[in-house]
Amino acid sequence: MAKEILFRDEARQRMAKGVNILADAVKVTLGPKGRNVVLEKSFGAPSITKDGVSVAREIELEDKFENMGAQMVKEVASKANDEAGDGTTTATVLAQAFVNEGLKSVTAGMNPMDLKRGIDQAVAAVVEELKKLSTPCDNTKSIEQVGTISANADKSVGEIIAQAMEKVGQEGVITVEEGQSLQNELDVVEGMQFDRGYLSPYFINNQEKMQVELEDPYILLVDKKISNIRELLPALENVAKAGKPLLIIAEDIEGEALATLVVNNMRGIIKCAAVKAPGFGDRRKAMLQDIAILTGGTVISEEVGLSLENASLEDLGTAKKVNIDKENTTIVDGAGQQADIDGRVEQIRKEIENSSSDYDKEKLQERVAKLAGGVAVIKIGAATEIEMKEKKARVDDALHATRAAVEEGVVPGGGVALVRALANVGTIKGDNDEQNAGIALTFRALEMPLRQIAYNAGAEASVIVQEVRNGKGNYGYNAASGEYGDMLEMGILDPAKVTRSALQAAASIAGLMITTEAMVADKPEENAGAGAPDMGGMGGMGGMGGMM
């Protein structure tokens, strides 16, 4: 296919136009008084959002060269979102400022490579200052404030995230689901829960809740399918003599083995239940081992020379309580040694560090949570499905932001941290005037988030930036109330990681765009129908009526 190629200024101008179209749509959402954006859906009602990355993802431009610019800024938003889970709008505003300021300098005849080196030098210095500005976020109040800000000043979201983190700890897994009521709800699962239910409804002993409840049971863990009852009999007899309930977790239990367990349970000879082991393949083996460590038991596996016929009570784990419903099994208060559990958690953490797959990391993190903390589910309440989806996206953002805050601490919010870091950096000198121009344009770009927040709040941006610049420490502008003051005291915080990721992602992509000299795209195809033969002569077929 033939290609269309643009060079120099023409290429950069078309690219900048695409950047500005996308950034202008995204930046209206910034700050406490940011507006909504309505997104058309191919079917069903449109969705309404204040989430920058959701807006960016929807934008595709007709002009291929403009679209390239837009897609590169979309990459900035996605990169910030992937690394910190928030800060996408800030990253987009910064990228737009870097590109526009940079292209002005390039058009004026400056060397793009030196400009980029100046930008990189200034960004590195500002990142170091942000680290110095950050304060630890380790109490419920600051976690609540970060969650509130990230959820667009929705206090209820900040509160529920802080409660969830308090309940399950910072290692715990917090998930967000759509709820059934108008209010947000928090559901905390203590102990280890996995998504496997009872193998037969005949194990149910609490008819009201349709659950199996086992108090102080033995737990038999088997890494294979059980279909022959003779293998199970010795273990069953030992447990029956001890007079305790039994939970069997195996790859599968079927045929006469399952039938015998059901009959013994119904006759009251031994209170028992059976569930499939969670996960598949190697992950199932690892999760069985997790359960063994949590309950103080041993996985009966032929790989390590253990057979089911020779299993003794010492090989079985125990727990204070086990609840099993149709879909989930929850083990509460396993009898495993704390030192063993801590060792296992440390081992899984090392696996997380060495893993390159996001999916594997997420699954490993879930295993850590099940061993060390717990699982909390935030159920989102709303009056309509459209509101529910918008709210869920905001809560997801807020959750990522609070995790980022716990990780790297918090800095003053509302665009103040960048302005303050800028003031603290002092004078940086490049190797030549063009690098100095790159440093200067970075300093101008860093004010843009504060300007945009002020603009969205209907205030005079230049006056506010000057006032904040003249202040010290955490002094800044509260766009929600229109007042100046200490941002930390007013509860306006941003996670340092979010601000840092936004700045680095924006500078990285903008540096590439400034140094672009040519753009190549497919040539638009001519109208395919233009060369087709004229069908006008078919009109004479009207006379065919006489053939009837």
UniProtKB/Swiss-Prot annotation:
Coiled-coil regions listed in the entry: none
Described purpose of this protein according to its UniProt entry: Together with its co-chaperonin GroES, plays an essential role in assisting protein folding. The GroEL-GroES system forms a nano-cage that allows encapsulation of the non-native substrate proteins and provides a physical environment optimized to promote and accelerate protein folding.
Residues noted as binding ATP in the record, renumbered to the chain: 29-32, 50, 86-90, 414, 478-480, 494
Entry keyword set: ATP-binding, Chaperone, Cytoplasm, Isomerase, Nucleotide-binding
UniProt gene name: groEL
Main EC class the enzyme belongs to: isomerase
Location(s) in or outside the cell: Cytoplasm
HAMAP family recorded: CH60
PANTHER family, A to Z: 60 KDA HEAT SHOCK PROTEIN, MITOCHONDRIAL
InterPro entries: Chaperonin_Cpn60_CS (IPR018370), Cpn60/GroEL (IPR001844), Cpn60/GroEL/TCP-1 (IPR002423), GroEL-like_apical_dom_sf (IPR027409), GROEL-like_equatorial_sf (IPR027413), TCP-1-like_intermed_sf (IPR027410)
Signal peptide: none
Assembly with partners or alone: Forms a cylinder of 14 subunits composed of two heptameric rings stacked back-to-back. Interacts with the co-chaperonin GroES.
Reaction catalysed by this enzyme: ATP + H2O + a folded polypeptide = ADP + phosphate + an unfolded polypeptide
Molecular function per GO: ATP binding; ATP-dependent protein folding chaperone; isomerase activity; unfolded protein binding
GO CC field: cytoplasm
Organism of origin: Alcanivorax borkumensis (strain ATCC 700651 / DSM 11573 / NCIMB 13689 / SK2)
Pfam families reported for this sequence: Cpn60_TCP1 (PF00118)
Entry similarity comment: Belongs to the chaperonin (HSP60) family.
Phylogenetic placement of the source organism: Bacteria, Pseudomonadati, Pseudomonadota, Gammaproteobacteria, Oceanospirillales
Name this protein carries in UniProt: Chaperonin GroEL
Main localisation: cytoplasm
Biological process according to GO: protein refolding
EC number: 5.6.1.7
